[in-house]
Amino acid sequence: MPFSNSHNTLKLRFPAEDEFPDLSGHNNHMAKVLTPELYAELRAKSTPSGFTVDDVIQTGVDNPGHPYIMTVGCVAGDEESYDVFKELFDPIIEDRHGGYKPTDEHKTDLNPDNLQGGDDLDPNYVLSSRVRTGRSIRGFCLPPHCSRGERRAIEKLAVEALSSLDGDLAGRYYALKSMTEAEQQQLIDDHFLFDKPVSPLLLASGMARDWPDARGIWHNDNKTFLVWINEEDHLRVISMQKGGNMKEVFTRFCNGLTQIETLFKSKNYEFMWNPHLGYILTCPSNLGTGLRAGVHIKLPHLGKHEKFPEVLKRLRLQKRGTGGVDTAAVGGVFDVSNADRLGFSEVELVQMVVDGVKLLIEMEQRLEQGQAIDDLMPAQK
């Protein structure tokens, strides 16, 4: 849990080596970077809101690793964390985001007209398409560190802004604490709502404090545009629908996001953003675009093929299980999405998914007919 700074001062009575965590059995990005020397250098520092290096790393100390993915092992508590603790965050960001340097500049492109194709992914294979991102509101602490009052203020601001959306984006807000157990579970099963805070990453970082206070979901009337409020990020914006029309999903995503930003600006609030890291979010893995464009895709043959992991790697894609990050694939259905977030624009990332998914379908069709796929192996993107 985030501590007050008087507690941090108390800890400074012990030498740094006595406070250094045991990372000997760990496999996450933080554990690769954090040395006793770096810990000693950073441990007396804190951000203006009181977030310390111990708060940054706690989730990675408590969660040594993950069987499916290399976790990051740290979080930011506020916008300043990435600057105050940059000696820790910069190498983690470089490691996680394919060599992204502290001097690199991020690019943003939320113009759906720049996406080539994407309206014709075969619905016999692509069951659903989804694009999501996160946004943080400048001037508030991030979920690992925010107070109840901050969280409630974020909810109020967000609901006011979202209630101004109209046309096919018009919808309503559902506060988590006023939902029945059955309503919650139905939304979770339909992939509309974030899970209950059982994830050790959420729990250890302090993001689940006061649950379900000031958490909720806003969605439009046909449930194709959703905003999660106060889960891992202040806002998670999601556009989704059945079938393979990624172009339509991305267009709705860009339009909705642009309108939300305009509504916040009209109330004199802006999103956390800087030219180097792009949009600032709680987890360093989401910096930049924060964007994950994914499809649920049926690949019963390719999914079992020994080359499948290599194909995904070359296409800069990653797979998750059917139910998300902590789950296995059911019935040969995979959640396939872009592996990158930072250093590429939104349009570039969605383009990689569209082009990559087309190739995956072509490979699956070859394997259905008992043919080889060696000649279809892509070059490394």
Swiss-Prot record:
Give the E.C. number(s). Answer: 2.7.3.2
For the cross-link Glycyl lysine isopeptide (Lys-Gly) (interchain with G-Cter in ubiquitin), the position is 45, 101, 107, 381
Q: Report the protein name in the record.
A: Creatine kinase B-type
Assembly mode = Dimer of identical or non-identical chains, which can be either B (brain type) or M (muscle type). With MM being the major form in skeletal muscle and myocardium, MB existing in myocardium, and BB existing in many tissues, especially brain. Interacts with SLC12A6 (via C-terminus); the interaction may be required for SLC12A6 potassium-chloride cotransport activity.
Q: Which InterPro entries does UniProt cross-reference here?
A: ATP-guanido_PTrfase, ATP-guanido_PTrfase_AS, ATP-guanido_PTrfase_cat, ATP-guanido_PTrfase_N, ATP-guanido_PTrfase_N_sf, Gln_synth/guanido_kin_cat_dom
Q: Which SUPFAM superfamilies does the entry link to? A: Glutamine synthetase/guanido kinase, Guanido kinase N-terminal domain
What this protein is reported to do is described as: Reversibly catalyzes the transfer of phosphate between ATP and various phosphogens (e.g. creatine phosphate). Creatine kinase isoenzymes play a central role in energy transduction in tissues with large, fluctuating energy demands, such as skeletal muscle, heart, brain and spermatozoa. Acts as a key regulator of adaptive thermogenesis as part of the futile creatine cycle: localizes to the mitochondria of thermogenic fat cells and acts by mediating phosphorylation of creatine to initiate a futile cycle of creatine phosphorylation and dephosphorylation.
Region feature (Disordered) = 96-122
Which intervals hold domain Phosphagen kinase N-terminal? 11-98
All disulfide bonds of the chain are none
What is the similarity comment for this entry?
Belongs to the ATP:guanido phosphotransferase family.
Annotated residues for binding of ATP: 128-132, 191, 236, 292, 320-325, 335
Residues modified to 3'-nitrotyrosine: 269
Q: Where does creatine bind?
A: 72, 232, 285
Q: Which residues form the Phosphagen kinase C-terminal domain?
A: 125-367
User: Record keywords: Membrane included?
Assistant: yes
Principal subcellular localization = cytoplasm
In residue numbers, the region (Internal MTS-like signal) covers 130-138
A Gene Ontology annotation in the biological process aspect, one of them, is: intracellular chloride ion homeostasis
| Keywords noted in UniProt | ATP-binding, Cell membrane, Cytoplasm, Isopeptide bond, Kinase, Membrane, Mitochondrion, Nitration, Nucleotide-binding, Phosphoprotein, Transferase, Ubl conjugation
Q: Which GO terms describe its cellular component?
A: cytosol; extracellular space; mitochondrion; plasma membrane
